Amino acid sequence: FFPVMVSGPILRYREDGEQFFEPHPFDYKQVTQGMQRMLWGFFKELVISERMALIVNTIYGNYEAYPGVYIWLGTVAFAFQLYTNFSGGMDIVLGLAQTFGLKLPENFRRPFFSKNISEYWRRWHISLGVWMKEYVFYPLLRSSFFTRLSKDMRKKLGKKRGKQITTFAGMFLLWFSVGIWHGGDWKYIIGSGLLHWFYIVSGELLEPWYLKCMEKLHINPKARAVDILRIVRTFFLVNIGFVFFRASSVGDAWKMLKSAATVFNPGILIGGQIFELGLDWIEFTIAVVSLLILFGVSLMQRKGDVRERIREKAMPVRWLIWYVLLFYVILLGYYGPGFSTAEFIYQGF
């Protein structure tokens, strides 16, 4: 199917194939909702991602001149650049498919709301995670080598610990493969692969200790404040991986992380320096407002399809919403003469 050939989602014939051979008569609702989703994707890509790219390129292109908080600012900007670029592309693809009456699998479910790394990968590039599990991880665990390894580890370390060690070994190869898939360079193998393996393994090993600490401190691990802290922690850990992903090399990534950890210059956030990173104050304000819109819609999506909720509004209201978004993209999007052609980052992987 032509829209998915460049950047996904990765389809599985047994789940998605039959619909390509079924008749799909014109359906006004499907066409309009598909176009609405495409518009939302263009908003993410042309209004947000392209603006974030200017900040990212300025800081990462000359990181030695932008130490400390600049590094964190550039990395957070890259997180949103990558997310809006990739998920925006998926919105365009899935929306286009919907106009033809086809339902493709979701590839993103608000990943920056994840409370741990495992959950993050169940929300980020979902089809890749499913493919890797089915065609790399499970076949590895069923292989003769891992079967023998599992038996040996269970004899030496006990049933529970032996199974855990075998699973961790399989996960190591899985995440190494994820890094290879992203490009094969060590910055991808570390930033998108092995670092996340380390996070997941560490989280599983430390979970009993974490729960005991929460119990001794009389803290409810399911409290809203705890959930917010876990979301912030997960976003922070993911951003460390993004430093490797975006840096020119592993060496540059280490230098940037060292600078981010040792130079304390939060004054740039309230001074004029922040408007010297590729966006003036007007463009920066547009970027912030657009991110707030994205955040608000993401919160609304947790309660169901936003398009369906808009569809329930009176006709003048729903048309006003979509026309405002359309003109927002037309007037504030980065496209046309004077701008670099918008590209989808994941086309390169």
What does each model-found stretch correspond to?
Residues 1-297, 301-348:
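Membrane-embedded transmembrane alpha-helical bundles that form the catalytic cores
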